[in-house]
Amino acid sequence: MSLTLAIYGKGGIGKSTTSSNLSAALALKGAKVLQIGCDPKHDSTFALTGMLQPTVIDVLTEVDFHHEEVSVEDVVHTGFAGVDTLESGGPPAGSGCGGYVVGETVKLLHEFGLYDKYDVIVFDVLGDVVCGGFSAPLNYADYGVIIACNDFDSIFAANRLCLAIKQKSARYRVELAGIIANRVDYELGGGTTLLEQFAETVGTQIIGRVPYHDLIRRSRLMGKTLFEMEGPGKEECTTPFLEMAEYLLNRPRSTVPKPMGDREIFNVIGGWR
């Protein structure tokens, strides 16, 4: 049975870059990996494939949603380290439901007999939206993973995501594996001090620390994973992903988080340093 991860975080926090490098690290550890982008921008897998690929919804629309006319090759593309990638896409802006799109994607994977072919499936999910639509990947996941950095807005979004995972855990098997600290800067950004206090408060842990480094920015622009890049800082940037991959493949300790109320987090976080 596949290990299924649903990765969330505040919009612009670096989910797609982080997800792609985590998928690459999992593959380099020997896992057969599928990354599913759940965002109408369909750029989740750009770093793995170097291209913007057609979405499931684009392909289904062309055949009037006749699934039997769609082949695996139409929607699944192989990227770096043999990671298979798929972009679910989404409805046009201002219409439709993202949850329906995710459901159609999973349905198609089952029809192809692919869902159980992989050791790991990674859902990279749009922004910090926790509506019934874009929280749908939690229905299929073993673990939720939250990406955050050491600032208020990011932690506020992480707290809301903890609430979504807690609510979903009442009906589904999903629990929170932990938080990936992104853009960690010990000189100007306070390192992970706020994130560590938040993790302890909601009953979870930091499972990886990704540095704030220009190599990561450049890799995203070039449509490459960090493992394909050259230059100063490569080992510093890739090591956290390899360590996280090893940790997740060993089925980590997980919890049902205990989120704070919105007013509570406003009051509490001001006292953290």
Swiss-Prot record:
Please cite one Gene Ontology biological process associated with this protein. light-independent bacteriochlorophyll biosynthetic process
A Pfam match = Fer4_NifH
Organism name: Roseiflexus castenholzii (strain DSM 13941 / HLO8)
**EC number annotated for this UniProt entry:** 1.3.7.7
Q: Where does Mg(2+) bind?
A: S16
This chain's function reads: Component of the dark-operative protochlorophyllide reductase (DPOR) that uses Mg-ATP and reduced ferredoxin to reduce ring D of protochlorophyllide (Pchlide) to form chlorophyllide a (Chlide). This reaction is light-independent. The L component serves as a unique electron donor to the NB-component of the complex, and binds Mg-ATP.
Q: Which cofactor does it need?
A: [4Fe-4S] cluster
Question: What keywords are annotated for this sequence in UniProt?
Answer: 4Fe-4S, ATP-binding, Bacteriochlorophyll biosynthesis, Chlorophyll biosynthesis, Iron, Iron-sulfur, Magnesium, Metal-binding, Nucleotide-binding, Oxidoreductase, Photosynthesis
Record text on cofactor binding = Binds 1 [4Fe-4S] cluster per dimer.
Q: Which EC class is this protein assigned?
A: oxidoreductase
Output this protein's name: Light-independent protochlorophyllide reductase iron-sulfur ATP-binding protein
Query: What are the GO MF terms of this UniProt record?
Result: 4 iron, 4 sulfur cluster binding; ATP binding; metal ion binding; oxidoreductase activity, acting on iron-sulfur proteins as donors; oxidoreductase activity, acting on the CH-CH group of donors, iron-sulfur protein as acceptor
